[in-house]
Regions:
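Low-complexity, Ser/Thr/Pro/Gly-enriched N-terminal "stalk/linker" regions
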Residues: 21-87, 116-117, 121-138, 174, ...
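N-terminal secretory signal peptides and thylakoid transit peptides that target proteins
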Residues: 1-11
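Aromatic- and glycine-enriched pocket-lining scaffold segments that form the walls
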Residues: 150-239
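Long, repeat-rich segments with strong aromatic
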Residues: 230-319, 327, 360
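Active-site-adjacent structural elements in enzyme catalytic domains
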Residues: 100-101, 105, 109-132, 136-146, ...
Length: 456
């Protein structure tokens, strides 16, 4: 039996009933499309030596990585924004969760090897820095040098992916214990820093805050968290560490954090999770703290699913179930944006990001770095309209589809499920410049593994 046949087997639980005249893609067509996406990701968007994930690469070549010297000099900026190594923790962590599901569904040596390769990249990102709790975004050509700024959007997917990997059955014994210890070391470092995501340079500040969330003092210049994202991510990490370590202290801290009201909030974190989040419509600016971008907040929907599956208390579970359903219904309206993508589009994508150094200036804090990167993005988008095009019509609909699928087969999102399948078969993966389409595998495998979640 071939790999594609194995992948297609059992997909029926994911497919919605469709009339004979429907043009909804069938099981085999979807499975073949996903296998094509998988092959393209491994061909172009994973570092062949270090296993880290690239943001973009030319269809026929490899990306231009920042040199170690450029990383040390903070070029193009300390956040690595607009470079090919901007989102290694973010994309790699979520991709590892999909590869872990892929292995559980088809326990082959090839699937194990693929997951191990991405996991090795995530381990490298956790060990690259010298600051406790720091997760690097990516590494330079030497496999070690990195930009100093991390973020919540890098850190939480790292935890989520490593949790999925450690629960997949791929790693056992001493190897598993070592990786659990690494996760706990990262969490301990964050806890000592009041759950703020530190920069790996003394005095540079932090970028992300799971306790303080958004306030007059915490703004987008310090990576302040929307309340929903901060609450769901913080709770997931605590409960996952309890499940992995068996240490009662993590469970006690989880229950304390779950029931307390953060800062001046009128609601507990559990109540914040139940409300979910109103995503900023794709193609429009985010409005923090209550309307974050759909794609950066999507991993918080995965946090809710993890909490639903790990939480022993039925009352708390019902809150997580409510949040999952609310987010899925809100995201469902954006899945059909895939229709705006034309596979024959030839708009420009500038892969040599070094033109951004013309706007470069020294940075002594995370605030300086955010201001510089915000200035650079205007020129980046002028030179690379194709990048914006793929964000609008590849990234956003696929992340929306993932949010829908993470909630399981729910009546409220039934109309979107046909659009999810059409999105998975719409793209010609080999013509894409960005790696956002890794999310197609997340969508597919979440649909297969979580479709049964029809009851609280």
């Amino acid at each position: 039996m071939g790999r594609r046949t194995v992948l297609a087997a059992g997909l029926g639980a994911f497919l919605p009933p469709a009339p004979a005249a429907s043009n909804t893609p069938g099981e085999r067509e979807v499975a073949q499309s996903i296998e094509g996406a998988h092959e393209e990701m491994f061909r172009r968007f994973l570092d062949p030596e270090y296993g880290t994930t690239y943001d973009y690469a030319p269809p026929g070549g490899t990306p231009l990585l920042p040199t170690p010297q450029e990383c040390r000099e903070l070029k193009p900026n300390a956040l690595a924004w607009w470079s090919p190594i901007e989102n290694g923790g973010f994309f790699g962590g979520l991709y590892l969760s999909a590869l872990s599901d892929r292995f559980r569904l088809a326990r082959s040596a090839a699937n194990e090897q693929g997951a191990r390769r991405v996991a090795s990249g995530l381990v490298r990102l956790a060990r690259a820095g010298g600051t406790p709790g720091f997760i690097a975004r990516g590494v330079s050509t030497d496999g070690l040098t990195h930009f100093p700024a991390s973020s919540s959007d890098q850190t939480f997917p790292w935890f989520y992916g490593m949790t999925a990997y450690l629960m997949s059955g791929i790693v056992k014994g001493n190897e598993k214990r070592e990786l659990v210890r690494l996760m706990e070391e990262v969490a301990d470092g964050l806890q000592r820093n009041a759950w703020r995501m530190p920069c790996d340079r003394a005095g540079f500040g932090h970028f992300g805050d799971w306790l303080g969330a958004f306030s007059d003092a915490n703004t987008t210049l310090t990576g302040a968290e929307p309340h929903f994202d901060a609450a769901s991510r913080l709770l997931f990490v605590h409960l996952a560490l309890y499940r992995l370590t068996g240490k009662r202290a993590w469970l006690d801290l989880y229950r304390q954090r779950r029931d307390e009201r953060p800062g001046e909030a009128a609601r507990s974190r559990l109540e914040i999770c139940a409300q979910g989040v109103e995503y900023a419509p794709p193609g429009t600016p985010a409005r923090y703290p209550d309307h974050p971008p759909l794609w950066t907040s999507a991993s918080s929907q995965a946090a809710l699913l993890g909490l639903l599956r790990m939480e022993p208390d039925p009352g708390a579970r019902s809150h997580y179930r409510k949040g999952l359903d609310a987010n899925a219904a809100r995201a469902a309206r954006y899945v059909d944006r895939y229709q705006g993508f034309n596979n024959l589009d030839q708009s420009a994508f500038e892969h040599d990001w070094r033109f951004l150094n013309e706007l470069w200036r020294p940075q002594s804090s995370i605030q300086d770095a955010v201001r510089l990167a915000t200035t650079q993005v205007r020129e980046w988008h002028k030179r690379s309209p194709r990048k914006v095009y793929e964000c609008d019509f590849v990234r956003d609909p696929l992340f929306a589809a993932w949010i829908v699928n993470l909630a399981g087969n729910r009546a409220s999102t039934a109309p979107a499920r046909s659009q999810v399948l059409k999105a998975l078969t719409h793209y010609r993966w080999s013509c894409l410049h960005t790696s956002h389409f890794f999310m197609a595998e997340c969508v597919y495998y979440s649909g297969r593994t979580h479709a049964h979640l029809s009851k609280p």
